[in-house]
Amino acid sequence: MTHRQHTHHSSNIQEYNPDSGTAQTTKQKSGKVPGWVRILIASTLVVAWLAISGVGGPYFGKISQVSTNSSTDFLPSTAESTRVVQEQKDFYPSESVPATLVFTGGSGEGGTFTDEQKTYLDSLPTKFADNTEYFDGSSPVIYSQDGQAAEIVVPVKSSVAVKDGVKKARELTPEEHGLTRQITGPAGFAADLVVAFGGIDGILLLVALAVVFLILLIVYRSPILPFVVLFSSVAALSGAIFVIWHLANAGVVKINGQVQGILLILVVGAATDYALLYVARYREALTRHRSRFDATVEALKNSFEPILASGGTVIAGLLCLLFSSLASNQALGPVAATGIVLSMLASLTFLPAALALLGRAAFWPALPKLDSAQGYEHKLSTGLWARIADTVAAKPRRIWIGFALVLAIFAALSGTFHAEGVRQSDLILGASSARDGQSTLAKHFPGGSGSPANIILPADKLDETIALLDGDAGVASTAALAQDSPSGTVPVGRSAKNLPPAFASIKPTESNGRVMLQTTLTDAPDSTAAEETVKRLRQDLHGISSEVLVGGTTATTVDTLAAAEQDRATIIPIVLAVITVILMLLLRSVLAPLILLAVTVLSYLATLGVSALLFNHVLHLPGADPTVPLYGFVFLVALGIDYTIFLMTRVREETLSVGTREGMRRGLIITGGVITSAGVVLATTFAALAVIPLIFLVQLAFIVAFGVLLDAILVRAFLVPALVEDLGGRIWWPSRLR
C-alpha cells in the first residue's frame, strides 16, 4: 500500500514506506493533540459503550415480549385471508386462536369410550366456559364416527400468550379415567413454536459467542484481544436490541422469532468481521508508528472506507426487503440494517478507542515490532498467501475457468432446490406434541378438523355457496356461525341432515348483510391437497360473488406462499441493481462491478445446488419455505460483496503505485488471512442458528455458512484474483487506471 508520512511534535519516530522500502525518521508537527486529550477521548468512547451495553443488556430478555409468530400478522392487508381476519371480528366478540384437544384411550369394546369416560369428557366444556380469562368458551364434545376419539375445540383469547393458554388447557383436562389427551390445531402448533424459539435469547447467543471466541483465540493467539473484539460485538448487539425493542414496542416494525435469531447472529458476525479488518490495519500501523495513537489514526483512515462501504452495501441490500409484501420480510430489512449500523459504529469507535488505550499490550504475547521494512517484504514473498498469489499470477486464465466450471456444475443443480413451502407439522425438527396430536386427529376425524376454512359471504348468496361447498370433494362438512346455537354454530347443507329438533329453528348470524361459514376440509390443513381445495373454492366462490372471502389456517398458508414467491421475483433484481451501482461508485469502474457481481451470483447458485443435494438426498428434508432462498440470496450477495470490497479496495490502493497485476498480488497476500478469518467467523455464527430446531433456521444456517466459506476461501482467494490477473488494467474500465 502507499503510505503517507506523518510528522510529529516532540519525538522522532520511525515509519516504513513500502514504496521506498526504507524506514524513515520524521519530526512531529507542532500543534499535535496532547496525549492526555487523546486518552480522554478514547476513555470517553469506551465508557459510552459500556453505558450502552448496561442500558441495552437487560433488553436481551425482553425482546421476545414484542415479537409475534402469528402468520396473519405478517400478511399484507390486501390478502384475502387477512381480510377475513378483519371481517370476522364482526362475528366474534374477541380475537382468538383455536386449540383442538383430542382424546383417545377408550376402555370400552374396540377402544370406544365407556359411560364413565363420556361423563368426564362431557363435563370439560363447562370448565372452559368458566375460565373466561383464558378462553372464549369451547365447542361441545365431538365424538368420532368410530367412537374411538373425541375432540373439543377451545378458542384461546388473543390477550393471553398462546403458550399459557395451551398450558391452562392441559391443567383443566387431566388425563383421568385412562384417557390420553393431546393438543393440536393453530394454538398447539403456535405453542410448539414458542418452545422452539425459547433458546433464542440464551442458547443461540451463548453458542455464537463461544464459537467466535474460540476462533479469535486461534486467529490472534492472544488472551486479551479476543475479549476486546467480542465485547465490541456484544456492545453493538446491546445497542441494536435496545433500538429495535422500542421500534417494535411502538408498532413501527413487526418482528418474529426468525427475525430475532437472524439479528443476533448477523450483528455478532458482522461486528466481528469489521473488527478483524480494523485490527489487521491497526497491527500493520503499529509496525510503522511508535505511538499507539498515531497508529490508531492511520488504522482508522485505512479501514474507515472499506468498513463503511461494506456495511453500507449490506444495509442497502437489506433495505431492499422493504419492497416485500410480507411484513416479516419488511421488518428484517430495517431491523438487520439497524444491527449493521451499530456494528459499524462499535468497530469504528469503541474498538479503536479500546485498542488505543491498550496499545501493543492488546496483542500480547506476540507484540507488533516497530521496524517492518524487512517484515513487509518478507510477507510479500513468503507464506501461504504469497504462494497462493504466485500460483494465481502464473496461470490466471486456467484457474478462473476451472473454478467457474466447478461452480457452474453445482449451480446447475440449484433448480432442484424445492422451495414450495413446508407443512406446518414439518416446521419443527424433532418432537412436536401438536404434530402428534394432528396425526391422531386425522386417524379418526376429517383431516381439517379444528382448523376450518372461514368463509364470509353476502347473506343473499348463502344457498348458492352451500350448494357449491356440498358438491366439492375437498369439503367434509360446513357450519354457519349462529349466536342462538349452544355450540355457536349450526350445521348447514348436507351436514344438516338428521339435525336435532333443537337446531331446526336456528338461523345463521347476520352482520352487515354478511354471514360466516366454517368449512372443515377432508385433508389436513397443512397439506398440499388442502391448499389446492382452498384455491379451487376461491375460484369457484368468486364466480358466485366477488365479495366472498375464504380465510383460515390453510388460506393463510396459500397467501403467504404466493406473497413469498412474488417477493423473490421483485426483490432479487432490486438487490442486484442497488449493489451494482454501489460497487461502480466505490471502485470507479463499470466492468469490475459487473464481473464481481456475476461471480457472487454464481457462487450463490452453486451454494443452492449443494444445499439441494444435502437437503434432498442426505437429510431428506420435506422442502423449504420460499423465503429461504430469498434470505440466502440477500445475505450471501450482500455479505459476499463485503469480502469483495475488503479485497478490491486494497487492490485499488496498491494498484495506484505498482499496477493492477502486482496490486492484485499484494492485495491478496495482505488481505487473504483477514478475509478468510472473517469468513470463518461469519460462517460459524450463522451455523449457530442450527441450534434452534426449526427447519427454516437450520436450512438458512447451512446455506449462509457454506456460501460464506465458499465465497471467502475459494472465490476471493482464487476466482476473483485470477480474473483480475487475466484482465489486468482492463478490469477498471472505463477508468484509465492500469
Per-region residue spans from a language model:
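A short acidic, glycine-rich active-site loop
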Residues: F74-P76, I409
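Structured non-transmembrane domains adjacent to transmembrane bundles in polytopic membrane proteins
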Residues: T68, S77-T100, G106-A190, T416-G623
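Membrane-embedded transmembrane helical bundles of large multi-pass transporters/channels
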Residues: M1-V66, Y134-F135, V141, K157-A419, ...
